[in-house]
Amino acid sequence: MRHISPEELIALHDANISRYGGLPGMSDPGRAEAIIGRVQARVAYEEITDLFEVSATYLVATARGHIFNDANKRTALNSALLFLRRNGVQVFDSPELADLTVGAATGEISVSSVADTLRRLYGSAE
């Protein structure tokens, strides 16, 4: 399983800001390491092998962690999709992704529900 680094998470954010605008930066760069650490700890301790569950964990942790000054939801979605692509899953844009990301960020949609939606959209990685 190929994970995302804190530096890549920050680069995803910076690319979003460059492309779509918004307030750059973050209050504490160490928080990117904390988000990535949270994902990797969950994967290790819960022995998660399902790519969609891990991808959903990236999305929820980043969106709810609110580590950037702006573009947290965009960065969260991009991190989830990057993780899937990096691990051999073909991804594409879907109108469902915006509502999914907002629901995950607000806590209305759980990690497992995010994973179910990603699995339905992008199919089995096995």
Swiss-Prot record:
Reactions catalysed: L-seryl-[protein] + ATP = O-phospho-L-seryl-[protein] + ADP + H(+); L-threonyl-[protein] + ATP = O-phospho-L-threonyl-[protein] + ADP + H(+)
Origin: domain of life: Viruses
Keyword Nucleotide-binding: yes
Fido domain location: 4-120
Enzyme Commission number(s): 2.7.11.1
Keyword Transferase (UniProt): yes
A Gene Ontology molecular function term of the record: protein serine kinase activity
Swiss-Prot/TrEMBL keywords: ATP-binding, DNA-binding, Kinase, Nucleotide-binding, Repressor, Toxin-antitoxin system, Transcription, Transcription regulation, Transferase, Translation regulation
Effect after changing A76E: Loss of toxin but not transcriptional regulatory activity
GO BP term (any one): symbiont-mediated suppression of host translation
Outcome after substituting L118P: Loss of toxin and transcriptional regulatory activity
Subunit structure: Interacts with cognate antitoxin phd, the exact ratio of doc:phd varies from 1:1 to 1:3. Interaction with phd prevents kinase or phosphorylase activity on EF-Tu. Interacts with the 30S ribosomal subunit.
Function: Toxic component of a type II toxin-antitoxin (TA) system. Phosphorylates EF-Tu on 'Thr-383' in vitro; can use ATP or GTP. Also dephosphorylates in the presence of ADP or GDP. Can only phosphorylate before the ternary aminoacyl-tRNA EF-Tu-GTP complex is formed; interaction with cognate antitoxin phd prevents phosphorylation and dephosphorylation of EF-Tu. Overexpression results in inhibition of growth in liquid cultures and a decrease in colony formation by inhibiting translation, stabilizing mRNA and polysomes; these effects are overcome by concomitant expression of antitoxin phd. Antitoxin phd binds to its own promoter repressing its expression; toxin doc acts as a corepressor or derepressor depending on the ratio, repressing or inducing expression.
Other notes: The concentration of antitoxin phd in P1 lysogens is far greater than that of the toxin it antagonizes. Such an excess may assure the well-being of carriers of the addicting plasmid.
Annotated protein name in UniProt: Protein kinase doc
Taxonomic source organism: Escherichia phage P1 (Bacteriophage P1)
Gene that this sequence comes from: doc
